[in-house]
Amino acid sequence: FVAPIVEAPGLSKTVVFPSGNNFVDYWDSTKTYEGGSTVTLNVSITDFPVFQRAGSIIPLEVSSRLTGHGLASDGHLTAMIVPTHTSTQDSQSTQGVHTATTTSVRRWKEESMDMSYKWPRGGLFQFQSTPHPTRGVIVLLRTITACPHSVIDELYGNEITAQASLEDMHSKGYGYFCDLRAKQLFVHLGHSSPHGNSITIKGISTLYAL
C-alpha cells in the first residue's frame, strides 16, 4: 500500500487505510496501523510512505540501499513477512479441557519459486520454500514481540545458531538475529539449496499472531 508525497512542502500526509486488514510501515516494523483508520503522518518531501499488509509475504531482491534493508542481503531473496492468524479456528473440548488451534497459511509464488508459512499453534512458526536456481533465502519476520527459543533447519535436522548482531549473521552467511527493539527477526538460510528450505521457529510471538 503506497501513499506517495506529491505536493510541497509535504510536511504531513493523511492516509486512509483500507478496512479489513492491518498495516505495518515498510521502513519501520514498530509502526503499525489499523485497517479503516485515518492517520495523519509527519513526513517530508523526500519520504516515501509504503505499508505492508499484515499476513503478506513480500519477496525482495535487495541490490541497493533504496530498499532500506542494506546491501549485505544482496544475492539473496529476502522474504519479508508480517505473520497473522486466519479467522478459521478449530476448537474442541475434551474432559472439560478446552483446546483451540489456529492455522495460518500464506503463499507467494512465481515461475521459479514458491514460499509459504504456517502458524499452526501458539509460539510455533513454520516457513518453507522451493529451491531457487541462484539465490539463497533470508526470512525477515516483522512486528515480533518475543524472541524465539530456537530456530530449527528441518531439512538438515540441526539448530540454527543465534548471532550477536545483524552484521555477524551476514558475515557468517547463516544463522539468525533477533532485534526486539526494531521488532524484527532475521533468519539467514545460506546459499541456494537444491532442496529448498524448511525451518521451524519455536517460542516466538508477534503483534498479530501469538
Regions picked out by a protein language model, each given a short descriptive name:
Residues 1-173, 177-196:
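Catalytic core of carbohydrate-active enzymes
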Residues 204-209:
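Short acidic/polar inter-strand loop motif in beta-rich domains
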